Amino acid sequence: MTAVADRSLGPELARTETLGPDTDVLVIGLTSSENGPSIAPDDMFGDVLTEDVRAELLDQLGAVGAKGKAEELTRVPAPAALEGVTSVLAVGLGAPDKLDAEQLRRSAGVAARSLTGTEVVATTLGGIDIAAAAEGFYLGAYTFTPFRSAKSAPKPDERPVAKVEFLVPTADFGEEALFRAQLVAEAVATARDFVNTPPSHLYPAEFAARTQVLAEAAGLDVEVLDENALEAGGYGGVLGVGKGSSRPPRLVRLTYAGGPKKVALIGKGVTFDTGGISIKPAQNMENMTSDMAGAAAVIATTLLAARLSLPITVTATVPMAENMPSATAQRPGDVLTQYGGTTVEVLNTDAEGRLILADAIVRAGEDSPEFLIDVATLTGAQMVALGTRTPGVMGTDEFRDRVARISQEVGENGWPMPLPAELRADLNSKIADLANVAPHRWGGMLSAGLFLREFVPEGVQWAHLDVAGPAYNTGGPFGYIGKGGTGVPVRTLIAVLEDIAAE
């Protein structure tokens, strides 16, 4: 058993007041306007970017057609005055009035992906927003290579940038912001690592073991329930989903005790989802290695809460199972008893995530949290409704809106969705308390949210994030997002926890 890689293996992030002798490339920002591009920020780093250097750079950039459009990349030879620097990379930031933290994060990510084979980079982007720039550089440089042999391992000129130095105007500028940004980026990368690890190597017992290693190293309380403990405890949802696999399920609980206010995090941890007896189409089934992205996010967030010493208590309850078809698998038409006693008729074994989440939500409710957030790659309907980059956020109205707002502020773009009362009757069963799916395709994301609501304790502020599309990028890289696991919604979750802690 090997723990998830130490994310300190990402690029080193540092602050500097001067260009060092080892700097290979200087990264600057360009904004666009009708009058041509401008270097941003325009009021800092005059000792490095003197008026003459700025003029020379703008002449060179203009000569090769640089416009400053968002995420545009233009590389030119460094002016002689920038001693030791071989080239300058100008990354587009777009129009100044539209430049925000997320655009800067994306532009920094694009720059980082273009700097493979570079050892040391300096940048002025931190003068705009050092936290956003740092997150963008770190996450844009992310790679996942544990399963590459010497035959396909990255060559020196293919390796991500090793060190990013942020030019700062004073010695203490951005110190705390950079510290937090690196911790956040490392947490996102940890979630990505979990998601990108193939199911041959990340199955429930292994997922639980890796989580335990990380949690104990962070000083968290850890509880792991194996299949026998799950049976004894009556966790019918987790057991039902996992019974078709030769690799039995687990339920992991992590607790960071930082203060009296309690927040429960729940994450769907289906390490591979074939659909079970209601089997999925073979095409693209390999992407179901990502069906534990919700679990990865809440684990990484709980570890991050501890690293940031937030003054609240955060408990993650993470059910882990593999959904496989076999002679022992649950069948369409079976009835199972969830933790807490609710009976559910399983009409579709591919609607399994809600079954394991229901057990976890009831268990988490026994801790009397004030807030409860569950995260899951729950429905294909999320992508039909909102696309692949916009999480659906459901829950109690006030908290749902709060989580969605914060998600938009951090650039993960959660969107508030309703839980229409008229859809609830579609989850009635003729023989049990509930059916796990509605008898039609309409509003599938919302029906799943309504199902989960049945298990949320009364009076708890609750949010449900469906990240089926946003948690895993099957297309080409964009911004600071590469192919595979994205780490969404770690940045949303930690920002929500910080917001709760600040109340």
Curated annotation (Swiss-Prot):
Which residues of the sequence carry a binding annotation for Mn(2+) 2?
A: 268, 273, 291, 352
Q: How is the cofactor bound?
A: Binds 2 manganese ions per subunit.
Annotated Mn(2+) 1 binding sites: 273, 350, 352
The protein's UniProt keywords, in alphabetical order, are: Aminopeptidase, Cytoplasm, Hydrolase, Manganese, Metal-binding, Protease
Catalytic-site annotation from UniProt: 280, 354
Q: What Enzyme Commission number(s) apply to this enzyme?
A: 3.4.11.1, 3.4.11.10
Mind telling me which GO cellular component terms the entry cites?
Answer: cytoplasm
- Keyword Metal-binding on entry: yes
Q: Which InterPro entries match?
A: Leucine_aapep/pepB (IPR011356), Macro_dom-like (IPR043472), Peptidase_M17_C (IPR000819), Peptidase_M17_leu_NH2_pept (IPR023042), Peptidase_M17_N (IPR008283)
UniProt catalytic activity: Release of an N-terminal amino acid, Xaa-|-Yaa-, in which Xaa is preferably Leu, but may be other amino acids including Pro although not Arg or Lys, and Yaa may be Pro. Amino acid amides and methyl esters are also readily hydrolyzed, but rates on arylamides are exceedingly low; Release of an N-terminal amino acid, preferentially leucine, but not glutamic or aspartic acids
Q: Which compartments is it annotated to reside in?
A: Cytoplasm
Q: Which GO terms describe its biological process?
A: proteolysis
**Similarity field:** Belongs to the peptidase M17 family.
UniProt function note: Presumably involved in the processing and regular turnover of intracellular proteins. Catalyzes the removal of unsubstituted N-terminal amino acids from various peptides.
The name of this protein is: Probable cytosol aminopeptidase
Question: Which species does the entry assign this protein to?
Answer: Nocardia farcinica (strain IFM 10152)
Higher taxonomy: Bacteria, Bacillati, Actinomycetota, Actinomycetes, Mycobacteriales
